[in-house]
């Protein structure tokens, strides 16, 4: 009853212009329903499985799967983590054009077994990737910002914390860690 009263008064005062809301208005780039942990090891099978779920959630359009496979073939997104630490597995940041998505979201995908992606910097180099940050972005002006935020997160998070994240088997733990540690605004 007390909490209902406090909430009621907060809403009432806000509507009357007497107070600011105290709720968290932080924009999230993550959705707990769009976090994946998989045993799949084939890149295209991973994309197929995740794409179907994202389509069911309304985040991607029908042609998303074909475009993400084609784009990954032409413009690889693997990132070697060796410059940060030899202890870390490699990651990838696959993405498509905004025409194929309906949201702005980062979809974390933990791989129990590695999958081969080519290096973004050196496309002829194959990397054994264990974690994906799949970028969904329907705002073309935000693409480089989201990618920069991912790079800042990787560079600014301890090796131990990244290892724990990359090797997690729990969708909830992955979501909670990213939601609490990924900085959206600076």
Identify the residue ranges that each predicted region occupies.
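Cytosolic covalent-transfer regions centered on His/Cys nucleophiles
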Residues: 1-186
């Amino acid at each position: 009853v007390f909490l209902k009263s406090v909430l009621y008064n907060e809403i009432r005062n806000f509507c009357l212009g007497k107070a600011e809301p105290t709720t968290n208005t932080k924009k999230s780039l993550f959705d707990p329903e769009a976090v994946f942990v998989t045993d799949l090891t084939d890149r295209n099978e991973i994309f197929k499985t995740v794409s179907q779920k994202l389509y069911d959630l309304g985040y991607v359009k029908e042609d998303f799967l074909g475009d993400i496979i084609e784009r990954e073939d032409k413009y690889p997104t693997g990132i070697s983590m060796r410059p940060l630490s030899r202890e870390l597995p490699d990651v990838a940041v696959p993405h498509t054009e905004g025409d194929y998505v309906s949201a702005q979201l980062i979809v974390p995908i933990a791989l129990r077994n590695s999958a081969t992606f080519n290096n973004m910097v050196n496309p002829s180099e194959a990397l054994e990737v264990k974690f994906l940050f799949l970028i969904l972005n329907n705002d073309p002006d935000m693409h480089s910002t989201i990618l920069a935020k991912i790079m800042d997160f990787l560079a600014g998070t301890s090796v131990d914390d990244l290892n724990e994240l990359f090797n997690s088997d729990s969708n909830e733990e992955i979501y909670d860690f990213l939601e609490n540690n990924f900085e959206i605004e600076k």
